Amino acid sequence: MSRKTTVRHFEENLSELDTLVTQLESNQLSLEEALKAFEKGVKLSQECQSVLTQAEQKVQILLEKQDGEHLETFDPELNS
């Protein structure tokens, strides 16, 4: 999958995830519909997380190549 396709796919998944959250928060779905929406949301969330993880790894590799030094894994909790 090309970079543009991956970014487009990520953006589409994120948009769909946002729509699902809005639907779930509206409390207008039946239990069955809510469970299906939740299940789909979990899947989309996992796909988005996978793309973000891959992007983070690419950035680390590029920075290592540029600086020629070993980088520590980014920990968002330490940097907040």
From Swiss-Prot:
It comes from Marinomonas sp. (strain MWYL1). It is an enzyme of class 3 (hydrolase). Its EC number is 3.1.11.6. It catalyses: Exonucleolytic cleavage in either 5'- to 3'- or 3'- to 5'-direction to yield nucleoside 5'-phosphates. One of its GO terms (molecular function) is exodeoxyribonuclease VII activity. GO terms for biological process: DNA catabolic process. The lineage of its organism: Bacteria, Pseudomonadati, Pseudomonadota, Gammaproteobacteria, Oceanospirillales. Heterooligomer composed of large and small subunits. The keyword Ligase does not apply. This is Exodeoxyribonuclease 7 small subunit. HAMAP family: Exonuc_7_S (MF_00337). It holds the Pfam family Exonuc_VII_S.
